Amino acid sequence: MPEISPAELAKVSSSSSSSSSSSSGRASVKIEEIEGGAAASGVVIVSEELETNPKTVVASIADETVAESSGTGNKSFSRVWTMPLEGSSSSDKAESSSTNQPRLDKSKTERQQKVTHILAEDAAKIFDDKISAGKKLKLLNRIATVKHDGTVEFEVPADAIPQPIVVDRGESKNGVCADESIDGVDLQYIPPMQIVMLIVGTRGDVQPFVAIAKRLQDYGHRVRLATHANFKEFVLTAGLEFYPLGGDPKVLAGYMVKNKGFLPSGPSEIPIQRNQMKDIIYSLLPACKEPDPDSGISFKADAIIANPPAYGHTHVAEALKIPIHVFFTMPWTPTSEFPHPLSRVKQPAGYRLSYQIVDSLIWLGIRDMVNDLRKKKLKLRPVTYLSGTQGSGSNIPHGYMWSPHLVPKPKDWGPQIDVVGFCYLDLASNYEPPAELVEWLEAGDKPIYIGFGSLPVQEPEKMTEIIVEALQRTKQRGIINKGWGGLGNLKEPKDFVYLLDNVPHDWLFPRCKAVVHHGGAGTTAAGLKASCPTTIVPFFGDQPFWGERVHARGVGPSPIPVDEFSLHKLEDAINFMLDDKVKSSAETLAKAMKDEDGVAGAVKAFFKHLPSAKQNISDPIPEPSGFLSFRKCFGCS
């Protein structure tokens, strides 16, 4: 299958009438140090699904990326150093002059230094607002290539040290103390509003927003949850108003599993991606202003809550002149503490840059559709590709729905960003389990849960055989969730295995001794809350991120990528989870998370960042000059 350059990807995207990518793509980067003589610079090779760690580029764009996440505007670029500093010590000079190296070697080293310096400058120019859009595309095409398997190869020097991060913690634009705790926000302060939630993804992506919507509704607000038609019954049963968004989560999930991310593995894959994204993007505006499809009651949104995969949400908010608040279950704001979950970068100096690279590659696939929406539907001017006009930085508030006991808020995230806690939806209290399931659970020891939710499994029969054999070898009982993947087709029934369809995790997991799953944020949260040691088998997207966090916290083994799933690894993982120390660590973490109320935290964060009460909610919301930034296209701060 042919490789695809960013320029070719952009060309196909622009000429196609279809749409781009989904929430849980993966871009990974392999970083290697290349030897090339005494003074040669290291080179970062980004391959195997886009990651990135150009230390040099991080040094050159640190001011810009800090501005984006902290709300400060600084467009200055530091000088990119890829060669030894001129101010080296006299002893270093003496040693250098006394070394008698062949002229050929010296020439080779100098050439490599020159090449790496050029690469660094090229990478830095991608984020320079003085460079034209066409030039930026050529630069990106020069240093990045989408490989046949949907991965990206990217080369830049890696010898620079990132600049220290300075976060402005002054007063926010809405008159709220920048570091004011969300616990101090008055929930009764905001008058009733009509709020629309624009949510794209699987059932696990939608569920926490159902919990938040119900809480907002309790405070007197009208909440419309706009998501895929597949989840209409789920939303209506929760007592919420539903509006259909485009896109089919089954198709999106199947594409992501096949391609290991949002980058297409070949030209034939691009239309699949784009058809889905076009349907999503063009359904956002109607969701904000069209009458209720069932009752016909009129609706006009006063505010938007969205997740990043609802590409186009910020543009709709701009057109309607209403505030928007982005919530997500995985990091989407640049930080130097860990890389973008859709990337893999080992060196900390590349963590921040990984967010820029992931955004730029997503933007390649959707910019024509977004601009078409802006011109034809929103009556706005087009967005410049990879615009560096950060201005005062994005002021879009972000709320991250995970426990700070699992992943604390990074120190370089500014006042517009909150870590609110996991957002649980109570499904257990109204659940009536089948008598057969209750009898099986009571007939023996607590089982181990194994399931991969709504993700399609490539070889379900083989995976089922591995699961059953691993349970038998470790002498454990197991519950297999068949899900969308078709697990559980046993050749013959097993007394120690129980097969089930959907069961609320908050009911089932407290009755299990350990869990094995794909690593979705919601499933991970439910397992940890139930004190269950956890093994994560990531398929794509943010799942490896959660697998690594679980392992780092000591409550589970190293994640097992689905392509490496084997009897030996699953057996080792089960034995790891059965260790008393691991169980104790899981209980300690669950105890720390016990008093968290992520739903209340999300509601308070939403209220905290709304315009001041002195400003009418229907008044235009001032937007920073950086609205045309490519980062803004994804709702990134």
Curated annotation (Swiss-Prot):
Gene Ontology molecular function terms on file: sterol 3-beta-glucosyltransferase activity
Tissue expr: Expressed in roots, cauline leaf epidermal cells, stomata, stamen, pollen and around the base of siliques.
Phenotypic consequence of gene deletion: Reduced growth rates.
Keywords: Glycosyltransferase, Lipid biosynthesis, Lipid metabolism, Steroid biosynthesis, Steroid metabolism, Sterol biosynthesis, Sterol metabolism, Transferase
One GO CC annotation: cytosol
Extent of Polar residues compositional bias: 67-79
Keyword set includes Cytoplasm: no
Basic and acidic residues: bias regions: 103-112
Stored SUPFAM superfamilies: UDP-Glycosyltransferase/glycogen phosphorylase
InterPro entries: EryCIII-like_C, Glycosyltransferase_28, GlycoTrans_28_N, UDP_glucos_trans
Swiss-Prot/TrEMBL GO biological process terms: carbohydrate metabolic process; lipid glycosylation; seed development; sterol biosynthetic process; sterol metabolic process
Pfam families, per the entry: EryCIII-like_C, Glyco_transf_28
Catalytic activity: a sterol + UDP-alpha-D-glucose = a sterol 3-beta-D-glucoside + UDP + H(+)
EC number of this enzyme: 2.4.1.173
Biased composition (Low complexity): 13-24
Region (Disordered): 1-29, 66-112
Enzyme class: transferase
Family the UniProt entry places it in: Belongs to the glycosyltransferase 28 family.
Function: Involved in the biosynthesis of sterol glucosides. Catalyzes the synthesis of steryl glycosides (SGs) and acyl steryl glycosides (ASGs) which are the most abundant sterol derivatives in higher plants. Can act on several sterols like sitosterol, campesterol and stigmasterol. Both UGT80A2 and UGT80B1 are required for the normal production of SGs and ASGs in seeds.
PANTHER family: STEROL 3-BETA-GLUCOSYLTRANSFERASE, STEROL 3-BETA-GLUCOSYLTRANSFERASE UGT80A2
Name of this chain's protein: Sterol 3-beta-glucosyltransferase UGT80A2
Gene giving rise to this polypeptide: UGT80A2
